[in-house]
A protein has these predicted regions:
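N-terminal Rossmann NAD(P)H-binding glycine-rich loop of SDR-like oxidoreductase domains
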Residues: 6-26
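Conserved S-adenosyl-L-methionine
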Residues: 23-32, 117
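Conserved residues in the N-terminal Rossmann fold of short-chain dehydrogenase/reductase
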Residues: 37, 59-60, 100
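Conserved Rossmann-fold cofactor-binding substructure of NAD(P)-dependent oxidoreductases
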Residues: 51, 57-78
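Conserved Rossmann-fold NAD(P)-dependent oxidoreductase catalytic core, especially the SDR/UDP-sugar
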Residues: 78-81, 85-145, 149, 161
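NAD(P)-dependent short-chain dehydrogenase/reductase
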Residues: 133-136, 141-223
Length: 223
């Protein structure tokens, strides 16, 4: 469905973007993929991987910046919203900043998508949004509800929104695996409860789930 289309990924220099971009280029050959993120160094490093590929465009910006989002969303067909404050302790210590990015940023993405006539938006979320026990989960729950409700907000523009909730993503920055690796030689393994389990998903499966959401969605789904 992405053939000859323009795709934008917010937070596109993160772990998901690094997996999504090459796989999508290979499978669908879109006209353009726009990487929208606020870290110029990460963009510079990522750009070296695609030097000479006219299908890749980099756009410095923050989802908190409504005007910049509107500029970036021009002529975009599909948006993957991956930008977020997601490290739990960081969110707890910086609650106002977490809300600005995860909730206000979501509202800006929704408005820009409607007004720029984007066809479909898939927002990345987390299983921590289900019965949240921390600020990160609470802000993502609010964000999810905004995206679901926005399917009745677009009016005649027809923009459609869906949400994908991941568990612990193997290979992503901030995942628990690097922490486990760092303490494996200490002989101690701190866990919340001996019966605790973690649901894990690979980045490859995460990308495939986003593809499925775009192809399957009618608007309002949480995958």
């Amino acid at each position: 469905m992405f053939e000859n289309s323009n795709i934008l990924v917010t937070g596109g220099t993160g772990s998901f973007g690094h997996a999504f971009v090459p796989k999508t280029l290979e499978k669908y050959n879109p006209k353009k993929i726009i990487i929208f993120s606020r870290d110029e160094m990460k963009q510079w490093e990522m750009a070296k991987l695609y030097r000479g590929d006219p299908r890749i465009r980099f756009f410095i910006g923050d989802v908190r910046d409504r005007e910049r989002l509107y500029r970036a969303f021009r002529n975009v067909d599909y948006v993957v919203h991956a930008a977020a404050t997601k490290i739990v302790p960081t969110a707890e210590y910086n609650p106002f900043e977490c809300v600005k990015t995860n909730i206000n940023g979501a509202m800006n993405v929704i408005d820009a998508a409607v007004d720029c006539r984007v066809k479909r938006v898939v927002a990345l979320s987390t299983d921590k949004a289900s019965s949240p026990i921390n600020l990160y989960g609470a802000t993502k729950l609010a964000s999810d509800k905004l995206f679901v409700a926005s399917n009745s907000y677009g009016g005649e523009h027809g923009t459609r929104y869906a949400v994908v909730r991941y568990g612990n993503v193997m290979g992503s920055r901030g995942s628990v695996i690097p922490f486990f690796m760092s303490i494996k030689d200490k002989g101690e393994f701190p866990i919340t409860d001996a019966r605790m389990t973690r649901f894990m998903i690979s980045l490859d499966d995460g990308v495939k789930l986003v593809w499925h959401a775009f192809e399957d969605m009618e608007g309002g789904e949480i995958y």
